[in-house]
Amino acid sequence: MLEKRYLVLEDGSYYEGYRLGSDDLSIGEIVFNTAMTGYQETISDPSYTGQIITFTYPLIGNYGINRDDFESLTPKLNGVVVKEASTHPSNFRHQKTLHETLAQYHIPGISGVDTRSITRKIRNHGVLRAGFTDNKDNIQELVEQLKTAELPRDEVQTVSTKTPYVSTGSDLSVVLLDFGKKQNIVRELNLRGCNVTVVPYDTSAEEILSMSPDGVMLSNGPGDPDEVDVALDMIRGILGKIPFFGICLGHQLFALSQGATSFKMKFGHRGANHPVKDLRTGKIDITSQNHGYSIDRDSLKNTDLEVTHIALNDGTVEGLRHKELPAFSVQYHPEARPGPSDSNYLFDEFITMMKDFKEKERQINA
């Protein structure tokens, strides 16, 4: 017999379902993700640290979990909410079920709930604090706890690498600042021959420049960009000296370093099906996204940054480029995992930018 579990929201509403994953119950910010596939990559994305994910697709876990498709070594999210969790995956690569994987990483979950109703609530009211309980009598006590709960504010420090390491390539050298990177960023760079040195999020500009890289990337990551201000001086210290590419949180920090401001979105962009328009070409890409903060477009007016991409659903800023220096960024995930590969050409643009910059430096020093 399936054991009952309750998902409780800070507004006092609750949803009755069935136990999934761990019994180590936790609280977090509840969000929704609209991707139809790629649940393993989503669960292991460090950008979800401290959050509870509601999957809008009704069946999750149908092809199981395998060892190769993780985007980080250890998932850090605080919960998973699904309509139906498959107990008998069908895929030749699968090694564990969704339930087994969540239990292994001490992540609680719930199945058998109305995920459409939960998604509408988040969409209409904005993100909420949420938690789980296995005892219906504890619901009101949990509601009161949620109303005053302080959610973690040091997520980047939690997920960033503690020591530098290298993913070997044979051509250009890239330093990747790890704010909670997805592994596919490293894979995409390695596929293009780059030697990638992954360094902690608080590495200084001086330390980066001493490595003599051909380019610098700022990765995705969790949380509020205003709480990672340690990176702003570093960004200002390398701009113009090395080609620069920022993704997601890295994009936001790039903008903040140049005087722009960010804001918390009502319910964010999370999924593998978000349309983005390139303002330079008019081309539309379907993109993978995962962010709850965005850059205020009006705050860019007095900066040296120009908007290159916008979200078609709400018009928010999705891409920036420095008007004079070799530096650009996107709010979405060109590395995908999960999602379409429409935008992985941006890695090629970064490669071209590094080669052009290197050639220009060679000519100057000749």
Swiss-Prot record:
Glutamine amidotransferase type-1 domain boundaries: 173-360
Pathway: Amino-acid biosynthesis; L-arginine biosynthesis; carbamoyl phosphate from bicarbonate: step 1/1; Pyrimidine metabolism; UMP biosynthesis via de novo pathway; (S)-dihydroorotate from bicarbonate: step 1/3
A Pfam family: GATase
EC numbers, comma separated: 6.3.5.5
Residues annotated as transmembrane: none
Gene Ontology BP terms: 'de novo' pyrimidine nucleobase biosynthetic process; 'de novo' UMP biosynthetic process; glutamine metabolic process; L-arginine biosynthetic process
Described function: Small subunit of the glutamine-dependent carbamoyl phosphate synthetase (CPSase). CPSase catalyzes the formation of carbamoyl phosphate from the ammonia moiety of glutamine, carbonate, and phosphate donated by ATP, constituting the first step of 2 biosynthetic pathways, one leading to arginine and/or urea and the other to pyrimidine nucleotides. The small subunit (glutamine amidotransferase) binds and cleaves glutamine to supply the large subunit with the substrate ammonia.
Region feature (CPSase): 1-171
Similarity comment: family membership: Belongs to the CarA family.
Subunit annotation: Composed of two chains; the small (or glutamine) chain promotes the hydrolysis of glutamine to ammonia, which is used by the large (or ammonia) chain to synthesize carbamoyl phosphate. Tetramer of heterodimers (alpha,beta)4.
Keywords: Amino-acid biosynthesis, Arginine biosynthesis, ATP-binding, Glutamine amidotransferase, Ligase, Nucleotide-binding, Pyrimidine biosynthesis
Lineage, uppermost ranks: Bacteria, Bacillati, Bacillota, Bacilli, Bacillales
Name this polypeptide is given: Carbamoyl phosphate synthase small chain
Chain residues that bind L-glutamine: 47, 221, 223, 249, 252, 290, 292-293
Active-site positions on this chain: 248, 333, 335
Entry's Gene Ontology molecular function annotations: ATP binding; carbamoyl-phosphate synthase (glutamine-hydrolyzing) activity; glutaminase activity
